[in-house]
Amino acid sequence: MQLFSNDLGVDLGTSNVLIYSEGKGVVVREPSVVAMDKNTGRIMQVGAAARNMLGRTPGNVVAMRPLKEGVISDHEMTVKMLQELFRSAIKSSLFTHKPRVIICVPSGVTEVEERSVINAAVEAGARRVYLIEEPLAAALGAGLDISSPSGHMVVDIGGGTTNVAVLSMNGVAVSSSIPTAGDVFDDAIIRHVRRKHGVVIGQVTAEEIKIQIGCVYPRSEDISMIVRGRDSKTGMPRDLTLYSSEIFEVFRRPAKVIADEVQSVLEETSPELVGDIAENGITLTGGCSQLWGMDQLLMERTGIQCSVADDPDSCVAYGCGKALSWINTMTEGPINLARKRIMRSI
């Protein structure tokens, strides 16, 4: 067992939290969900166990996601969630100090939102906290050489936000963050199934539909799955069959929003860097980058080769882990980079 404090890299996502422990790799991979007894304030479950309680809890128990669109929406619950996950990450160490932590944040977050993340991590047990932009962490985790003058583009499509960035010489040249990502696709499925089929489904079921038959580019074969929900009129259980071609139509609008944003960032980028990107290609990371046809859609839209990184779910966490080597020469707070921020409200 180690006798010193662990340095941790944290992908604090809207849908999932991944924690990288120096020398060990990713040691925590849990949904960003907390279940709490409202009467006592006691945390009952965190992570996968809490996620399984969504929509199934008695009146005194609430299962919730304390982050929304990439930022903290419930400070107290975020602190309690991080306390449990930090404890899980360092349980194999006889640490004498609290850990130093690098946490990713979406591009273009405000100083207030940055401070909220830092405060939550400190209250959860971190000794020092450093922030890194998600696309920079994603690029590091995907193995891109961003130290050279040659430009690279990363599109990180997570649960709460899509972050698009052009990187060069260890910095972010142009970046954008929009709240159109995995959760928006899930919500679109929920609305469609209720409106068209008169069946009410929950977020867990919607995510299963997205993963199994969801697509943002036409499939050569129309695949299907059987879904069980509650009839909106009778309240009774009801099964229905959904097809990928149907979900493709549901996904058209949010997919277009993401493609529009990628194109917009390219238009804000210098011609020299755009030339580099055309040569190097666009790298996709994040869980929702694995939506069937996302790479094809963006390639058709931009005319640039697009590829999904290896283990795209973990790229940001691994990037935070690589950035741990920087913190001995840094001051606490955001990792300062020369960058041009673009924030859009979609």
Residues of each region from the PLM?
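Nucleotide/phosphate-binding catalytic cleft detector across ATP-hydrolyzing
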Residues: 1-157, 165-282, 289-346
